[in-house]
UniProtKB/Swiss-Prot annotation:
Cofactor note as given: Binds 2 manganese ions per subunit.
Taxonomic lineage: Eukaryota, Fungi, Dikarya, Ascomycota, Pezizomycotina
SMART domains, per database record: AMP_N
Protein name stated in the entry: Probable Xaa-Pro aminopeptidase MAA_08947
Required cofactor(s): Mn(2+)
EC number: 3.4.11.9
Family named by the database record: Belongs to the peptidase M24B family.
Catalysis: reaction(s): Release of any N-terminal amino acid, including proline, that is linked to proline, even from a dipeptide or tripeptide
GO MF annotation: an example: manganese ion binding
Residues at which Mn(2+) 2 binds: 275, 286, 480
Primary role: Catalyzes the removal of a penultimate prolyl residue from the N-termini of peptides.
Keywords: Aminopeptidase, Hydrolase, Manganese, Metal-binding, Metalloprotease, Protease
GO BP term, example: proteolysis
Amino acid sequence: MEMDYDLVMEDEFDALCLDVRRHHDSTSKTKYPAKLHARKVVRELGVDDGLIYLPGQPEISLEDSDQPRLFRQRRYFFYITGANFEDCTATYEVKHDKLTLWIPYVEPRQVLWFGSKPSAAECKRRYDVDEVRYTTQLSGFLRSFAAQPSPPVTYILHPKQAPDLGHGSQSQLCLDSSLLLPAMDRARVVKSDYEVAMVRRANNISSAAHRRVAERILRLTNEREIEAIIQAVCIASGSRSQAYPIIAGSGANGATLHYGSNNASLGGKQCVVIDAGCEWNCYASDITRTLPLSGAWTPKAAAIHAIVQRMQDECIAKVGPGAAWREIHLHAASVGMEGLLGLGILKGRREDVARAGTVAAFFPHGLGHHVGLDVHDVSGTLALSAAEGRGQQLDFGKRAMVTPSMLADMTRVSSSQDAVGGGQSKTQLLLPNMIVTVEPGIYFCREYLEGYFRSDPAHADFIDWDLLEEYYDVGGVRIEDCILVTEDGYENLTVAPKGDELLDVINKGKK
């Protein structure tokens, strides 16, 4: 069942009142398409026989403790089962198109302590698999498979995930750990319609959380209150897991790309960067908004926000089948450079600044990444974007550092390919049902700028250091949405308010 909610704050932040309403969820009666995914993997493997062996995540205790680690299912296992509980395994017999889910047997005394896991009958009803068996029978099945005359290849992700047959029988299996991972990555990069629905739902919940923060931001006093509201809204909607650690960085903290302390006072700050997205049924969302803490932008923050908003708007408009991500990233960098030149933060001849790649001092990360079972999801065989000649993939958004020299190399390669009519063979072209983030940002990190650029003759003269002092208090501005590539363009899956709507939501919260 899908859940809507009203989150009402009482006495500023003393209590939360949840009004929950249930209505029909169109995906609630639809099984996760495990067999569809398994067949996609086999097509990418290009084989007509063999066994795919994928263990799920076992229950693991914290170091030197009897308490379990927070459970997170292995994503490759989940992709071909949809099963989200501990100590399972999946096998797929390619020749017979047979997908088997192996589950742990739960003794009655275990139910007393920890509760039950789904039974074999329940799993058969719940999951799109051909058979459900207990893991106590798995080693016998594998020994029988290995005992065949010339047994087919068993495909595993990693050598450390080789199956344990017991009785020293492992050597009888013909194991391959080189082909399955890239095949599954190629299968995962283009989402099934069910997967799109999961990412959409995660975005809807996360967007509601961002909206609720905006409604309350004028009453909040500390970054941790932002984190608490986001978690409360997501949990109330049925999502207990965040896809990544919440970022709530105010003032100068917003210039740290992966700020995580979330405990600073909001007082006296111009902006707060909020980067937060929950998971729904193991599928991620990824959303960033930058909010003015007074309800109105300061002139400096307004100027930077306008540049970043233009970067995002124009880049989203370029998303569609056949688009090259590197070119979209370069467009974002160009818009950012023009904006900073217009403000005077960057100075000099436009051609010289572009050739040096100095704008990367302020926009130092990749434009975006795939989203799916992982927030920084797999890209398949080809990188979403790359700095050719440097072996640097830019598939992981703000986890992918883009230096000025890398940006300059990307620009040079792009220009040379345009001149000779070259293709994009080394990087990925967007395809329908890919989901990517578009997350440009401009940051004023004093330590980074002064530590690397002030003394570098290749860049120092292109930055007005006196004027820059006036912008350090802005911190950073980033705006991020999840974008679905469609047959004829794109769809923005993120419905969190931004632009003028965001300001309206913030200021209505005064009442």
